[in-house]
């Protein structure tokens, strides 16, 4: 009698779809980070705001999405020399503050997502974790993403996070005897254009 009840319970469990998560065979997808991808770091001084950008991503990097473990794997490696703040003096101070001679690259390692986005035509918000390496210091952050599909083979993934110079042991620059001071807070955004390379 107990065995019969157990068989009935298992049958109902499977027929209602509760078993789908374990029997489904999600396929990993691999995505190329296209050159049109950008990364920006915006901040402010006691006088005005500034924004330093890399307007063309030159790394041949790929990102892997795995629905089975909701993993989001890959690393962006950005040459700090490529940042442009649209002001020669500000650009130089920005790079100097990031110690680009000693640590020439900013690295963003993707770790996980809270859930897999559907990548539909409408923008969808999802959170995840990344590890940022800057000036020789690594920090783990939660990032808010906006994901949408551009066409059959291309998606856009925009990540946003606020952190500070101090998170990486850096001191914000100041000029003119301290009359112009850069605030600690930075708004970081990476806008990734991703092209699927496996079908």
Where are these regions (language model features)?
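Bacterial Sec-dependent N-terminal signal peptides
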Residues: 1-31
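Low-complexity, acidic/polar, glycine-enriched regions of mature
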Residues: 19-199
């Amino acid at each position: 009698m107990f065995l019969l009840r157990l068989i009935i319970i298992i049958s109902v469990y499977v027929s209602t779809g509760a078993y789908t998560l374990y029997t489904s065979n999600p396929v990993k997808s691999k995505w190329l980070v296209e050159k049109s991808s950008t990364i920006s770091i915006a901040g402010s001084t006691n006088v005005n705001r500034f924004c330093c950008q890399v307007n063309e991503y030159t790394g041949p990097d790929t990102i892997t999405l795995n629905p089975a473990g909701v993993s989001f794997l890959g690393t962006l490696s950005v040459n700090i020399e490529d940042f442009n703040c649209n002001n020669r003096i500000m650009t130089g101070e920005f790079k100097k503050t990031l110690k680009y001679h000693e640590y020439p690259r900013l690295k963003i390692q993707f770790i996980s997502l809270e859930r897999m986005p559907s990548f539909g035509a409408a923008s969808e918000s999802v959170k995840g974790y990344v590890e940022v390496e800057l000036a020789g210091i690594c920090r783990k952050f939660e990032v808010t993403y906006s994901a949408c599909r551009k066409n059959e083979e291309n998606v856009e993934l925009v990540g946003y996070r606020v952190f500070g110079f101090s998170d990486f042991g850096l001191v914000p620059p100041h000029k003119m005897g301290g009359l112009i001071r850069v605030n600690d807070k930075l708004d970081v955004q990476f806008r990734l254009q991703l092209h699927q390379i496996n079908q």
